[in-house]
């Protein structure tokens, strides 16, 4: 059954923001959808992490 999770892409790797129920080496299919930083605020991430994400998005011209 499909499941939606949020992840951050760092150094060529997608890092999930919550626990995933997968076995090591299990192959999955990923559908990418960019989200607004505002949604991270609603998730109550520390302000420092939010600012770090904003800087990263600006550096990558994703804003």
UniProtKB/Swiss-Prot annotation:
InterPro entries for the chain: AF2212-like, AF2212-like_dom_sf
Record-linked Pfam families: AF2212-like
Keyword Lyase on entry: no
Keywords on record: Toxin-antitoxin system
Keyword Methyltransferase assigned: no
Annotated family: Belongs to the UPF0165 family.
Role this protein plays: Possibly the antitoxin component of a type II toxin-antitoxin (TA) system.
Protein name per UniProt: Putative antitoxin AF_1084
Organism field: Archaeoglobus fulgidus (strain ATCC 49558 / DSM 4304 / JCM 9628 / NBRC 100126 / VC-16)
